Structure formats: C-alpha cells, structure tokens
C-alpha cells in the first residue's frame, strides 16, 4: 500500500497525466477536462512542444530532489546537468540561471498549494470553517513538502529576484494574486454573512496576511525546528489549529472557538477533502 500511494504521488508530480501548467501535481485524480488540468489529451500542443514541456517537468523534479537533499543554497546548474541526461546547453534553454530554476520550483510549489486551496472552497461549512479548511490544506501540504513549502521566503530574496527570468517572475506574481484574491473573497464573504467585522485599521488585506503569517510560521517551525524545546513540549497534534483559533477569536470571527468544535471541523476536512494525502502521510510516518 505504501508503495502504491508513493507511486501515485510520483506519477502526478512527474506530470504523467500530461503536463502543461502543473495544475495537477497534488490532485490524485486526473480529470477529463484538459483545459483545467493540463492533461495531454487536450493540451493543444504539438509533439515537439509537449516534449519540451515534459522535459521541463523532468528537470524541475530533478532540481526538487537536489534541493531536498542539499538545500536551495547548494543548487547549481552543474549539479542539475550531472543529475540529468541533458547537456548544459539544453538546460539553459529552459532556465537562464540557477535562480530561475529556484523560481520555477517556487511556482511549482505555489500551484500545488493553490490546488489544495481550491478544494477547500467547496467545503460544506460556515465561513470560519472554510478558513480553517485552508489552514488544514496548507498544513497537509507542508507535511508532504517540508522543503518546497518554504519557497515563499526564498522566492523573494534579492539574489533570486535579480537573476530569475522576467517571465517566471510575472508568473509567480500572477499566481500569488490568484491565491490572494481567493482568500480576500472568503474574508469578504464572512463580513457579508455577519460572521466577521472589519475595523478602521483592519480590512481583508490585514486579515489575509495575518492568517498566512500564522500558517507559514507555525508550519515552518513545526517542520524545521522540531528539536526546539518550545516545540518539543507541545504534544498536541492540533497546535496549528490552536494558533489559528487564537487569531480568529481575536478578530471576533464567529462562531468563536468556545462556541464551536473546530477540532471536529479539522478532522472532517482531512476526511472529506484530503483522505488520500492523509493516508499517504500515515504510511510514511509524517
């Protein structure tokens, strides 16, 4: 079973479902809608274009393995060339620098996160449960991709921004806007429903940023600083939920945690939206 689940994940990470825009990296079901998923059957690409797209996916996956083993700082074009079956010239046809490769990995990561967030939009619950569902999705993604989930910081460092291609920078910014727009819509819907109120100093922008900060910080520390005494003494598997609840209670986002069992919500999101990912994580003990 472990081998089977891992094989499924490797397949969709490698783009075997036909890869044009990486929308299906962590979606365990390749749907028929090619325009939506980027499936090869209706991608509209020529064989040569598809081969180029597939090769780029392969190179991104190799770069991902190198980063997981050695870290972002130790990634080089020479190492990527050695790990692949392609010449350095061919690799430079895809990426103008190692920073461009890093940005491609960050785009890969953000698209994967966006897929998880898209699932949570359809969760059957109140507005606060929907924001909790986003926290669940991000938590699961961070457990599956502890290295790539930190890309948000790496992608914004000057040494990456200065040397990455403008096209990839534009794509990353566009993706960020899409994710932010979805989060803004959720917050604004909560206000319209009467579950949340803005204050003169706090609007949707501040609330979205606060939730991202809680999610990113909590997961980054849990994944990368597990030996810290501050983290070791916390044995509760719902620690990320508690952090989110403290923020949301402080904002007065109803129902408050004293009025609703959000642990039950968290478990329901895992079961209804991410059962396959949870099953995989359990088999690899993460």
What are the language-model segments listed below?
Residues 54, 58-65, 69, 83, ...:
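Alpha-helical structural segments
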Residues 30, 40-48, 65, 74-76, ...:
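Short glycine/proline-centered loop/turn elements that form peptide/ligand docking sites
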Residues 144-167, 220-224:
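Amphipathic alpha-helical segments used for helix-helix packing
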Residues 3-43, 181, 185-193, 217-286:
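C-terminal peripheral helix-coil segments that are non-catalytic and often amphipathic
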Residues 117-118, 163-195, 204-220, 237-245:
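Amphipathic alpha-helical packing segments from all-alpha helical-bundle domains
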Residues 150-153, 198-200, 224, 257-260:
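Short, hydrophobic secondary-structure boundary micro-motifs
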Residues 128-147, 209, 241, 245:
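Amphipathic alpha-helical segments that line or abut small-molecule/effector binding pockets
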Residues 70-100, 104:
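Helix-turn-helix
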């Amino acid at each position: 079973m472990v081998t089977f689940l891992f094989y499924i994940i490797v397949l969709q990470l490698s783009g075997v479902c036909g890869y044009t825009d990486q929308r299906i990296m962590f979606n365990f079901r390749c749907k028929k809608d090619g325009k939506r998923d980027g499936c090869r059957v209706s991608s509209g690409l020529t064989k040569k274009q598809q081969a180029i797209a597939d090769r780029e996916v392969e190179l991104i996956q190799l770069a991902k393995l190198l980063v997981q083993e050695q870290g972002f700082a130790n990634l080089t074009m020479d190492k990527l060339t050695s790990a692949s079956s392609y010449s350095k010239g061919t690799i430079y046809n895809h990426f103008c620098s190692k920073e461009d490769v890093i940005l491609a990995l960050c785009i890969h990561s953000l698209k994967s996160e966006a897929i998880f967030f898209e699932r949570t939009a359809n969760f059957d619950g109140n507005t606060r449960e929907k924001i909790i569902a986003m926290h669940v999705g991000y938590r699961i993604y961070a457990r599956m991709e502890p290295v790539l989930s930190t890309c948000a910081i790496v992608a914004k460092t000057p040494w990456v921004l200065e040397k990455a291609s403008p096209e990839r920078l534009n794509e990353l910014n566009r993706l960020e806007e899409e994710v932010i727009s979805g989060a803004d819509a959720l917050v604004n819907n909560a206000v319209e429903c009467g579950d949340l109120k803005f204050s003169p100093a706090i609007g949707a922008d501040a609330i979205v940023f606060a939730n991202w900060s809680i999610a990113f910080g909590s997961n980054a520390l849990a994944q990368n600083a597990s030996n810290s005494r501050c983290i070791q003494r916390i044995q509760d598997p719902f620690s990320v939920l508690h952090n989110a609840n403290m923020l949301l209670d402080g904002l007065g986002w109803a129902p408050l945690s004293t009025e609703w069992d959000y642990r039950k919500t968290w478990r329901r999101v895992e079961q209804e939206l991410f059962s396959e990912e949870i099953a995989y994580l359990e088999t690899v003990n993460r």
